Amino acid sequence: MEEKYSGDIILISRMIEYFPQKSFEWNANEPITLDDVQFAINHHLSEMAIPFGDTFKYPPKKRTSQWHIRRILYFVNHPQEIKNIELDNESSTFDILPVPIIIDGYHRWMAARYLYELGSLHKIHCLYAGREDVLDYLKGKLDTMPQEEIA
């Protein structure tokens, strides 16, 4: 019997090499930064436990920036829930590129990034559907970032 895939543990520092920005934009021209998250914590903004939606199962509704910050705060306050971030690889017309992309889990990623900056979180759980060499790099098994495209 084949074992069901339950995900992988990857290094946040390796993900940051691909995603160095400290912000994400759910709403056009309204980026949410790690500084916004810190401001919300300092001002005791309440967290949001209700999920945003799944891009495949449930169409996400338009939410305010404050709602997204509150959702990030939920994961900051409950880091054990930072799991199942869905990753794949970027692709071009004919090639699979050695670049991971986040399919689902941006609130979790922003919380993980925030906690990493504090020095309190270094690894996260993901569901990875991409190239094995890129996964090995993200896990810390390879020292060199893959560069070659695969046809």
Model features per residue range: what roles?
Residues 1, 148-151:
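Short intrinsically disordered terminal tails
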Residues 16, 38-41, 73, 139-142, ...:
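Residue-level detector of alpha-helical secondary structure
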Residues 5-8, 30, 62-65, 127, ...:
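Intrinsic-disorder-associated interaction segments
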Residues 1-32:
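N-terminal extension/subdomain marker
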Residues 82-149:
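A short, basic-hydrophobic beta/loop patch
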Residues 8, 12, 34-37, 69, ...:
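Short amphipathic alpha-helical segments that mediate assembly, nucleic-acid/protein binding
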Residues 37-101, 113-114:
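Short alpha-helix boundary/capping and kink motifs at helix termini
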